[in-house]
Amino acid sequence: QGTSVAAARRLSDFTMPRDVSAYASDNAAKLAAIQALYAAQSGRPGRWRELGDSGSATFRCMDVFPAASRLYLSDRASWSAGYDTMALGTGRDLREVAKAIYARESGDQRVQAFTFRVDNGGYDTHSDQGGADPAGQHWTLHAEVGAALKHFFDDLADMGGGLDQRVTVVAWSEFSRRVRQNDSGTDHGSQGPMFVVGGGVNGGIYGNHPNIAASDLGSDGNTRYRQGAHDFRSTDVRDVFGTVLVRWLGIPESEVLDPVSGLLRLDDGAADTRWTAADFDLRRGADGATLFRA
C-alpha cells in the first residue's frame, strides 16, 4: 500500500483553497467545520483514526509553514533576495529549507521537520554533456548546485547559533556516468561520487579512487566492483547514510544495523553486502549536542 502525503512547492502554498466569491465570509466557518470532522475521528479505531490524525496534522502544517515563510521573508529579506538573484531552482528550493530552519531556531517548536530533500535534475547526459566547457550542460548543472549551496550555508551562518556547523547536506545521484564516452555524452555509470557538506563534517576524501584505466573497465565501459581479489567499490553508499543516521540524527546503531528489521544490512563478509570501512566516520567530534534537533 502506498502512503499519501500532503505536498506543496513552497511553504506559503501550504494552505487550503479559499472561496473568493460572495461567500468568502464563510471561509473561517468552513475550515473550522472540516477541522472538527477530522478531530472527531481521533477516538475511532483503525483507518478512521488514521484519516483523522492525517487530516489534523495537515491543518497543523497549514498553521505552521506559511507562518514560517512569512517570518523568514520579513526578517531575512536580503538573504531571500539573494536566492532570487541566482535565478536557480535549486537555490529557491533551498530557501524553503532555510525558512523551516529559521522558524525552528526562532523558537517555533511546532516545526518538527529535521530532514529535507531538494532535487536537481538534468544529469541524464547521454548527449551534449559538455565536458569542461563552462557553458556546457554538465558544468552548468554543477555550478548551479555549488552556487545554491554556498548561499544556503552563508545564510545559515548569518542566522547564528552555529547553524552552518549543525546542518549537513548529502549530495548524491541515483545513478552516475560511466567512464567511456558515448559520442557527445556518457551513459549510466556503475559508481559515482557523493558529497557531504557542513561545518560538522570531518573533511577529506573517503575511499580509494576507482580504477578507470581503459584496460580495467568492463566491456560496457563501466568501472568494475571487483577484479579478482581487488575491490574497486571504494565506498559504499551505506557508509555515508549510515554515518548520517547514527552520528547526526542520533539513531542507535543497533537499529540502523539490525540484521532483521534494521535500515541497513550487517556486514557478513560477502563482497556485495559488506561495508567498506568499519570505522567510517564523517562527523567531527564525539558528542551529538550540536545536532540540529537539539
Give short role names for the model-derived ranges.
Residues 1-146, 154-159, 206-210, 214-294:
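Feature for exported/extracytoplasmic and membrane-associated proteins, marking the mature portion
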Residues 173-206:
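Histidine-centered active-site microenvironments of extracellular/periplasmic hydrolases
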Residues 149, 153-183:
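Metal-dependent active-site segment of extracytoplasmic phospho-/sulfohydrolases and closely related
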Residues 109-113, 164-165, 189:
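Short gly/pro-enriched beta-turn/loop segments at secondary-structure junctions
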Residues 114-117, 168-171, 193-196:
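Structural recognition of the beta-strand scaffold that forms the well-ordered cores
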